[in-house]
């Protein structure tokens, strides 16, 4: 017999880059520009390596050309799979790793510098609260940082519980690492699903864990330094077409997201543009909200009318629209 359809009793939020942008974090379109600025400021070889990559992968473009972010990540990821080590290939094989590290540094430093009021913000508090479920594609630590600041009990992954916030990160995080990528001597890391922001946090075994969380949140003053010292490569799934290989180590996050969306009576999509080529997210959202005889009510928060059209095309025709951008207040 098939399993019974679960009751829709949860409030879920799907957060995209527009949510983080409300805190002045960089969105997807400006990431490469920000990486160039970081590299120039610190005289990093990454600046030259990126320009070499643009010339190699986009030979017809001008010297000032900076590619579209998703396309560039797709090219680099494909190169890692098929071109690495081939004679005459691109001369900086570690570029994707270096790029992830630079982005992690930018996001860590900017979250750390965010000034949170003692009482928080009403609009953010409606999202980051006990009993809610957050599903996000964002790599940054803003949700976790705010939850810690407001002492909101939180767990990464999905378990139905009114006593804590569930946060499901579909693209990984700046503070996650494959265990095999941990540096020798690394010690400050825990299981992803370990409960956070509680008086008594019980340590969970990590023997069978493929991905772990570096304890950057517990050390915000040196969050980036801790990540750099603990992993050779943060587990951040790049924005590219065909993410299935990178998704596999965090498959429980994806299955958990489906379970959570299947339980959602209301799904608020905040700051996510649902690009047509993001097939995995489209399929996940559609499957989750449509499961069972009573679909979830979808509400879209985005100033761009084309986003609302895509949600109605790909996710739910009856989705409600809020055209005001998300703001912290």
What are these regions (language model features)?
Residues 2-266, 272-329:
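Conserved catalytic-core helix/loop/strand module for nucleotide-ribose chemistry
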